[in-house]
């Protein structure tokens, strides 16, 4: 080896390159000025020879093999703004000319590091990842990745034979960002990051910021430029800014792309199914379509996201999805995406232990692992992680024009003890169970999305009653636009599952939601979680035979559409039979039309001024009635529902006098019902029912809901009606007076008759008493006579005996005397 060259070289540093142990190869490889020359060093393990061609000098310099591992070096005379290429010859004699990757300065600046480390680099996806570009007249790709715990990071791919010894990256900042520009790496090339830990472990990872991936589980990232199309939705994007989350209608059709695959030979690309989805959504009357995750995910596990920036390849290209959104917008359909910022799967081909240590997830498993599923929770305490998530949200909103995101259950990240037993969770710094870092992340997310994208919606699922989810951040809330009303869904479906015979005992499940209905801006949601197979799932929840199930299905959908709250239904195109599907399509189309055109059903959804119970106490009858109102009293609607399982004729109180017209009845024959309707204009009757002065007589099928529009009388009609009412009142008064006179006359006659009867009775009573007295006297006389007669006889009898005795004594004495 040339002695001068030998002395210039730093052999310990060369070993760092050969063994791929360093994090700053640029300080060794490439051209470095030494005195009046350049020391050019390169590492190509599989090369037989390497030469340097200097563009400035139009001269080639043969490089010496400094180490048999493939380390080459050469001395090149100094020249201003040196430009050079390597000419590499392999064992087969093939020559390849490449521009040295280590001849380029880094693109990331100190401001990027500061913003990223502070969690406020909201377009960091434009800096990290792979970005094809032209630098200094050279085409290639700029790579950057965040891996602070890595000892060495290399880019491997189609452009370097997937060799991790080549294209070793440099660490730019203590924050842990590695970068390199690789000439010749082009669009559609596959790549990965090869990471070596300080313990010597080497493994591969896909790019977290890749916008395209391929291979099983998306393990191969793909280089591509930012995609775009000739957007034609400017009118929609302008109109979107006017959306009022308090007063505007919102009817969401949730779909899974895979559900439409059977109609297209199993293809799930947006290119094939856009027209089908558009027709399906419009025919059912929805104004919004919500897609289950379209990001790269674990097969058959939509919410296990592997690459947050990449569209799942089964759904087609980025342009296909953009055209889908553009088409929907031009037809007046809003597009929402399901988005999962609350967890990610524990998988070696995703974000898990990305740089050899916990990076995107919490280090402590008491915080970082979901107990029930084993999924990993993002480390919201790392600003780089929250920056990743917020920039991802903005990426889909700004690049793909989507109109909003629906996040997965935030309760699982807001509460440190969610699904955890005592001792299995770690309290926050204040000893509480709130995840203060997750709380701050959610506020930062909603603030930044709304700040730059007015009209874009953020909807969330929250199941643990965290307060003020939809209140503004300024007022202490989380800043979401809407929250799923899971309590209503649970209670209502529980009520509807019961046989009508037993619903009376569950009436509170039907009415309880109105107690808390206005504490948040709610979306009433029949989601994929409850229905699984769309309306087929709801159909089989209902009691009874097929006819009764369909009637209860119509009733359930109708009730949801008239209850306060925005609407959300998970739909699958082939879930019901053809006949059932036609009926439900007709009904949902009509319900959505009423919902969107009748202000009473959405204008005051966030205020209790828009709802008034008429009768919520008829538990035994399984019936309810209420009024929906708007700022215009003429827009008032009356809703009556019969859930008893038997037909009923009822009287229902109404808040105002006027004419009422049935604008919807779920039992209409065109919806598959029996046709028991209330036809014509129904004039309110002045009769108190349900505490109201006026009422209607109605008839309802066994399981049916009816909606009545209200038309107040005109001034002329009111005058005529007032005159008629006065006449009616006058007649009523006359009838009352006559009735009272009749009652008085009847009372007098009754009194006369009573007096007459009384006199007769008293006379008869006196005669009876006299007869009784006479009879008694006679009986007494007879008794006394009898007693006297008996005594007299007895006395006479005694007297006769005494005389006989006396006469006998006198005779005896005379005789005795004569003897003397």
Cite the ranges covered by each PLM segment.
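Substrate-binding/active-site clefts of carbohydrate-active enzymes
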Residues: 212-214, 228, 234-434
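Short, flexible loop/turn elements at secondary-structure junctions
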Residues: 67, 147-149, 159, 173, ...
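Soluble or luminal CAZymes and related metallo-dependent hydrolases
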Residues: 269-273, 320, 384-389, 434-441, ...
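Carbohydrate-interacting/catalytic domains
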Residues: 1-248, 270-282, 550, 561-752, ...
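Short catalytic/ligand-binding loop motif for oxyanion handling, primarily in non-cytosolic enzymes
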Residues: 201-203, 261-263, 297-300, 343-347, ...
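Hydrophobic residues within beta-strands of alpha/beta enzymes
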Residues: 50, 153, 289-291, 403-407, ...
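Non-transmembrane alpha-helical segments in soluble domains
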Residues: 278, 325, 393-397, 446, ...
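Conserved alpha/beta catalytic core and glycan-binding cleft of carbohydrate-active enzymes
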Residues: 216-217, 221, 401-403, 421-575, ...
């Amino acid at each position: 080896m040339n002695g001068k060259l030998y002395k210039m070289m730093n052999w310990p540093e060369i070993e760092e390159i050969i063994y791929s142990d360093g994090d700053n190869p640029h300080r060794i490889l490439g051209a470095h000025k030494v005195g009046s020359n350049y020391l050019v060093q390169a590492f190509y393990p599989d090369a037989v020879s390497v030469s340097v061609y200097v563009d400035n000098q139009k001269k080639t310099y043969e490089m010496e093999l400094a180490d048999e591992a493939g380390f080459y070096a050469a001395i090149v005379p100094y020249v201003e703004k040196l430009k050079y290429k390597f000419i590499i010859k392999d064992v087969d004699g093939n020559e390849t000319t490449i521009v040295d990757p280590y001849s380029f300065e880094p693109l990331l600046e100190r401001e990027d590091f500061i913003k990223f480390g502070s969690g406020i680099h909201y377009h960091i996806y434009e800096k990290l990842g792979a970005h094809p570009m032209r630098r200094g007249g050279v085409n290639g790709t700029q790579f950057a990745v965040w891996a602070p715990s890595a000892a060495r990071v290399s880019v491997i791919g189609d452009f370097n034979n997937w060799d991790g010894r080549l294209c070793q990256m440099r660490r730019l900042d203590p924050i842990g960002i590695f970068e390199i520009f690789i000439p010749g790496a082009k669009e559609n090339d596959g790549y990965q990051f090869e990471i070596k830990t300080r313990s010597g472990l080497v493994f591969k990872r896909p790019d977290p910021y890749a916008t395209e991936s391929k291979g099983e589980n998306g393990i191969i990232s793909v280089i591509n430029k930012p995609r775009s199309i000739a957007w034609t939705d400017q009118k929609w994007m302008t109109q979107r800014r006017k959306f009022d989350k308090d007063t505007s209608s919102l009817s969401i059709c949730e779909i899974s792309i895979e559900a439409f695959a059977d109609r297209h030979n199993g293809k799930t690309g947006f290119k094939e199914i856009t027209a089908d989805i558009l027709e399906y959504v419009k025919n059912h009357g929805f104004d919004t379509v919500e897609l289950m995750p379209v990001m790269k995910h674990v097969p058959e596990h939509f919410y296990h996201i592997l690459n947050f920036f990449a569209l799942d390849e089964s759904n087609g290209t980025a342009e296909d999805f953009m055209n889908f959104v553009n088409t929907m917008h031009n037809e007046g359909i809003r597009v929402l995406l399901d988005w999962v910022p609350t967890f990610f799967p524990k998988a070696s081909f995703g974000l898990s232990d990305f740089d050899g240590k916990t990076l995107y997830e919490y280090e402590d498993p008491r915080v970082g692992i979901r107990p029930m599923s084993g999924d990993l929770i993002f480390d919201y305490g790392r600003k780089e992680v929250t920056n990743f998530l917020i920039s991802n949200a903005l990426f889909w909103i700004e690049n793909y024009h989507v109109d909003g995101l629906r996040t997965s259950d935030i309760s699982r990240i807001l509460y440190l003890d969610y699904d955890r037993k005592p001792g299995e969770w770690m309290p926050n710094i204040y000893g509480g169970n709130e995840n203060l870092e997750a709380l701050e992340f959610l506020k930062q997310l909603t603030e930044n999305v709304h700040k730059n994208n007015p009209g874009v919606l953020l909807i969330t699922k929250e199941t643990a009653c965290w307060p003020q989810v939809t209140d503004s951040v300024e007022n202490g809330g989380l800043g979401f636009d809407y929250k799923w009303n899971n309590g209503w869904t649970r209670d209502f479906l529980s009520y509807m599952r019961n046989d009508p015979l037993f619903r009376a005992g569950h009436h509170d499940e039907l009415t309880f939601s109105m107690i808390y209905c206005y504490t948040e801006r709610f979306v009433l949601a029949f989601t994929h979680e409850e229905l699984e197979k769309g309306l087929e799932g709801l159909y089989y929840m209902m009691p009874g035979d097929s006819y009764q199930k369909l009637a209860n299905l119509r009733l359930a959908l109708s009730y949801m559409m008239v209850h306060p709250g925005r609407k959300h239904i998970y739909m699958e195109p082939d879930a019901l039979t053809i006949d059932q599907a036609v009926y439900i399509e007709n009904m949902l189309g009509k319900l959505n039309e009423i919902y969107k055109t009748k202000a009473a059903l959405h204008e005051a959804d966030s205020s209790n001024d828009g709802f008034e119970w008429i009768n919520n106490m008829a538990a035994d009858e399984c019936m309810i009635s209420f009024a929906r109102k708007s700022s215009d009293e003429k827009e008032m609607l009356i809703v009556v529902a019969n859930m008893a399982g038997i037909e009923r004729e009822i009287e229902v109180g109404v808040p105002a006098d006027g004419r009422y017209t049935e604008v919807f009845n779920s039992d209409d024959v065109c919806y598959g019902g029996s046709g028991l309707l209330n036809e014509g204009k129904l004039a309110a009757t002045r009769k108190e029912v349900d505490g109201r002065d006026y009422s209607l007589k109605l008839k309802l099928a066994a399981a049916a809901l009816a909606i009545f529009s209200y038309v107040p009388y005109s001034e002329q009609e009111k005058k005529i009606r007032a005159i008629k009412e006065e006449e009616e009142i006058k007649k009523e008064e006359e009838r009352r007076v006559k009735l009272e006179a009749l009652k008085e006359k009847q009372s007098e006659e009754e009194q006369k008759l009573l007096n007459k009867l009384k006199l007769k009775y008293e006379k008869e009573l006196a005669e009876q008493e006299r007869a009784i007295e006479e009879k008694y006297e006679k009986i007494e006389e007879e008794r006394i006579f009898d007693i006297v007669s008996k005594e007299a006889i007895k006395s006479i009898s005694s007297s006769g005996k005494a005389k006989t005795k006396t006469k006998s004594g006198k005779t005896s004495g005379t005789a005795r005397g004569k003897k003397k």
